[in-house]
Amino acid sequence: MYEQAIVIRNDLKMGKGKMAAQACHASIQAFLHAQKISSSAVSGWMNEGQKKVVLKVNSEKELLEIFKNVNIEGLPCSLIRDAGRTQVEPGSLTAVGIGPEKEEKISKVTKDLKLL
């Protein structure tokens, strides 16, 4: 089974709409990266219904640690930096998108995170 994980910073106290927008940015950017490096995972994910899981971290440090580990594992990913026009400071790191990829590969990095 394939999935995509989106990790959101919970400490920024973004509104629901802002979090949804950041999650969408992370999802799309990670998907575009996956198309370049893992077309078979993208095809599998598309055929299985495009499962997504949204998780949370409580700091920029945690978000960057996840991003680092995702890169070490060689998974398609994205790191989202907000422009700061609304609720957060310019340049704030808000989210990481991971995959699509096989669930077991993603869970190696996300297994200790809680659902948003």
Swiss-Prot record:
It is an enzyme of class 3 (hydrolase). InterPro entries: Pep_tRNA_hydro_II_dom_sf (IPR023476), Pept_tRNA_hydro_arch (IPR034759), PTH2 (IPR002833). Its main location: cytoplasm. It is found in: Cytoplasm. One of its GO terms (biological process) is translation. This is Peptidyl-tRNA hydrolase. The natural substrate for this enzyme may be peptidyl-tRNAs which drop off the ribosome during protein synthesis. Pfam families: PTH2. Keywords: Cytoplasm, Hydrolase. It catalyses: an N-acyl-L-alpha-aminoacyl-tRNA + H2O = an N-acyl-L-amino acid + a tRNA + H(+). GO terms for molecular function: peptidyl-tRNA hydrolase activity. Its EC number is 3.1.1.29. It comes from the Archaea. GO terms for cellular component: cytosol. Belongs to the PTH2 family. The keyword S-adenosyl-L-methionine does not apply. The keyword Isomerase does not apply.
